[in-house]
Amino acid sequence: MTTFVKLRTKAKMPLVGLGTWKSPPGQVKEAVKAAIDAGYRHFDCAYVYQNESEVGEAIQEKIKEKAVRREDLFIVSKLWSTFFEKSLMKEAFQKTLSDLKLDYLDLYLIHWPQGLQAGKEFLPKDSQGKVLMSKSTFLDAWEGMEELVDQGLVKALGVSNFNHFQIERLLNKPGLKHKPVTNQVECHPYLTQEKLIQYCHSKGIAVIAYSPLGSPDRPYAKPEDPVVLEIPKIKEIAAKHKKTIAQVLIRFHVQRNVAVIPKSVTLSHIKENIQVFDFQLSEEDMAAILSLNRNWRACGLFVTSDEEDFPFHEEY
């Protein structure tokens, strides 16, 4: 059974990776080390998570121990929206690279399609609390990122949270040198993303699913929000296969040839979440999970929903 997805660059991206959003400094280092020991090779990072330095320490320690080689790892990071101008993009990238203590990234993504005003704040607002946008677009950012590939600092480029119209704009960009190899999006039984996944795959773009467990620890959860980890149908499927609910939620993506990056800092969960290659969900199981879709999102920069390039107004 294959454990990776092949990108258009011929690189192999492991189907299960470790997410690091919300992993607190002080815990993320041990989590990454435990994950390497458990067999993870794909690590999903981002400038805006403010914990890349510890992730880098963990990777370096494991390389020194000869537990893993750099070339066997698949390290991903993301450019935040306040750095879309080329000079700022270079600075942000250099900080990511030095924090991660690497000399190249396997994949560099545009984290979110809307540009935000440059400055110290990740979410800049005026005195009225309105989010300040940037004149620079994701197309400007892409040009700078392409130079990183040409310099050998990044192996491949991708996007995150893009709808298919935005991907289309990028693919049709005059003078495009490097096509996106991935689109990383929220995906779980309440947001199955069937049309977007179909579109991406038709364009040779791999999909990475974030928040596959419904992001239960997101800081802005409302009490009335649905809880993906408590869906009765998933519990039933898990019991039938003698697997955990999380394992079924992760396996659901693997069987769609979608990479998946569950986040955990709990040792037992880290081990469990990658043990998804020894069972198969039936066609009935898959159909039942897909039927749960309600286009419900746990994540998104909803404060910018009135601005240009907000990605989630479109059907897909």
UniProtKB/Swiss-Prot annotation:
Keyword Oxidoreductase recorded: yes
Keyword ATP-binding on entry: no
One GO molecular function term of this record is: aldo-keto reductase (NADPH) activity
EC number of this enzyme: 1.1.1.21
GO cellular component terms listed in the entry, alphabetical order: cytosol; mitochondrion
- Outcome of H269 to F/R? Reduced affinity for NADP
InterPro entries registered for this protein in UniProt? AKR, Aldo/ket_reductase_CS, NADP_OxRdtase_dom, NADP_OxRdtase_dom_sf
Keywords from the named record: Cytoplasm, NADP, Oxidoreductase
Catalytic residues, chain numbering = Y49 (proton donor)
Annotated compartments: Cytoplasm
* Domain of life per record: Eukaryota
Q: Which residues bind NADP(+)?
A: 20-21, 44, 160-161, 184, 210-215, 263-269, 273
Q: Which family does it belong to?
A: Belongs to the aldo/keto reductase family.
Note the PANTHER family from the entry: ALDO/KETO REDUCTASE
Function noted in UniProt: Reduces a broad range of aliphatic and aromatic aldehydes to the corresponding alcohols. Reduces prostaglandins. May play a role in the metabolism of xenobiotic aromatic aldehydes.
For this entry, the protein name equals Aldo-keto reductase family 1 member B7
